[in-house]
Curated annotation (Swiss-Prot):
Main localization (coarse): cytoplasm
Protein residues bound to Zn(2+) 1: 100, 102
GO annotation terms (biological process): lens development in camera-type eye; negative regulation of apoptotic process; protein refolding; response to heat
Stretches with biased composition (Basic and acidic residues): 153-167
Residues the record lists as N-acetylmethionine modifications: 1
Positions bound to Zn(2+) 3: 154
Origin: domain of life: Eukaryota
Keyword Glycoprotein on entry: no
A GO CC term attached to the entry: nucleus
Native organism: Alligator mississippiensis
Protein name: Alpha-crystallin A chain
Length: 173
């Protein structure tokens, strides 16, 4: 069975005219009116769900920046509170885990869970990293880089998630 690999921008261009694959579905998200129209939803194939009006940036894409003097990870976790998040440094990796139990939203009941793992550059000072959750749901993990080759701490260490009241403004490139 051949599976076509599409760039995310192309699969959204024609919306209901070209259905997306089963694995491209947005589980846990609500339905749009066109999802309930029998002509568009089930006549093409009952296993397809169209992804019209979905933003690529809302799909959980994270941004990793490694500048000359700073390492930063920005991750959209708007569906989670600080109590739902766990951020740890394990050896040379940052592990972010988010989980909330079933709760009611506009479309029914939902529970979510995710795991992300990022390799830390060896020049990051692991003892001075910070993790902040902004009011708009952006989790920002950052650590400064040290110029000397200091031995890094290899341990399992939790990083507290601080809450910030102002929204995150996108950093300029």
């Amino acid at each position: 069975m051949d599976i076509t690999i599409q760039h995310p921008w192309f699969k959204r261009a024609l919306g209901p005219l070209i259905p997306s694959r089963l694995f491209d579905q947005f589980f846990g998200e609500g339905l749009f009116e066109y999802d309930l129209l029998p002509l568009l939803s089930s006549t093409i194939s009952p296993y397809y769900r169209h992804s019209l009006f979905r933003s690529v940036l809302e799909s959980g894409i994270s941004e990793v920046r490694s500048d000359r003097d700073k390492f930063t990870i920005m991750l959209d976790v708007k569906h989670f509170s600080p109590e739902d998040l766990s951020v740890k440094i394990i050896d040379d990796f940052v592990e972010v885990h988010g989980k909330h139990n079933e709760r009611q939203d506009d479309h029914g009941y939902i529970s979510r869970e995710f795991h992300r793992r990022y390799r830390l550059p060896s020049s990051v000072d692991q003892s001075a990293v910070t993790c902040v959750l902004s009011a708009d749901g952006m989790l920002t993990f950052s650590g400064s880089k040290v110029q000397s080759n200091v031995d890094t701490i290899h341990s399992d260490r939790p990083i507290p998630v601080a809450r910030e009241e102002k929204p995150t403004s996108a950093p300029s490139s």
